[in-house]
């Protein structure tokens, strides 16, 4: 009996040990995802607003004799920087061409495009536009001595455009049979016209008025190529926060008639006496066709 007892006790003890579970290891708390910084906070942390502008398209964006960016669009961008960051100098300008405006937004090279970009259905699919700040129509510039009198005369001529502009898109869609000569930069297109490589240059009318005013011997055809359309700043598709901030800024600036000040400084001198500023600028972002 004693032998049996001695054998049973260890076996019973082993069975107890086998039935015991190891203490459960404490579960690690799930990491709480850090909330993504807002886009405006990202700009503030960076300390500067990055804006795509033209460098050769007066009166909107150009480089002056001091090597500084100036113009209607660039001054508006500086005001944005001042109101967002407290200092208009906290801005970085990136030179863009018409065809690079959208890619620069999509690749995050810039926060904002302020480069005379006309709002079109095709562009709306690629970027988000804010409320408009300007209105524009496409017209054509020809030498004073040119036999071209109307837009219809261009059907038998060579029309110069800058790649990616509204004029380029409009002619491609509406007159695919016209002979069109394309250049990447506005300055290259104007030089090509001066050199006689084409008969006319189709571009936003305010740009052409500026050129004709400074360069005697050219005239702008009175007819428009297409309808009048809004021009607006643009942000990357989906950047609702920055878009809404710009809309609020445009509304606030409208109360102080800020765009009228820029119009008087950069645009008025290029237009005929008596031109209504509201035919060019859109104060407060309120578009009225």
Regions found by a protein language model. Give the residues of each.
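Ligand-binding clefts/hinges and TM-proximal coupling segments of bilobed small-molecule sensing domains
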Residues: 26, 166-183, 220-221, 251-289
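Short helix-initiation/N-cap motifs at beta->coil->alpha
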Residues: 36-37, 91-103, 146-147, 181-191, ...
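Short glycine-rich His-centered loop
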Residues: 48-71
């Amino acid at each position: 009996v004693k032998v049996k007892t001695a054998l049973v006790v260890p076996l019973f003890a082993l069975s107890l040990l086998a039935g015991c579970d190891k203490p459960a290891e404490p579960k690690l708390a799930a990491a709480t995802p850090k909330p993504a910084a807002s886009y405006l906070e990202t700009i503030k942390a960076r300390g500067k607003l990055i804006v795509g502008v033209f460098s050769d398209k007066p009166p909107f964006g150009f480089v002056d004799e001091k090597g500084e960016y100036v113009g209607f669009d660039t001054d508006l961008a500086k005001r944005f920087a001042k109101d967002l960051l407290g200092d208009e100098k906290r801005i970085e300008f990136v030179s863009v061409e018409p065809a690079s405006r959208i890619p620069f937004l999509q690749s995050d090279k810039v926060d904002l495009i302020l480069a005379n970009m006309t709002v079109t259905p095709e562009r709306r699919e690629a970027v988000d536009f804010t409320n408009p700040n300007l209105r524009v129509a496409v017209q054509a510039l020809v030498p004073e001595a040119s036999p071209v009198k109307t837009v219809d005369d261009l059907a038998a001529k060579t029309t110069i455009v800058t790649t990616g502009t509204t004029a380029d898109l409009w002619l491609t869609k509406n007159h695919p049979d016209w002979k069109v000569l394309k250049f990447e930069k506005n300055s290259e297109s104007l030089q090509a016209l001066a050199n006689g490589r084409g008969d006319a240059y189709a571009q936003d009318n305010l740009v052409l008025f500026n050129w004709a005013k400074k360069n005697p011997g050219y005239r702008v055809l009175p007819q428009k190529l297409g309808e009048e359309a809004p021009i607006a700043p643009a942000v990357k598709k989906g950047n609702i926060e920055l878009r809404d901030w710009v809309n609020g800024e445009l509304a606030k600036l409208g109360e102080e008639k800020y765009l009228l000040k820029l119009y008087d400084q950069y645009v008025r001198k290029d237009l005929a006496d008596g031109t209504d500023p509201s035919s060019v600028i859109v104060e407060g972002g309120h578009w009225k066709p």
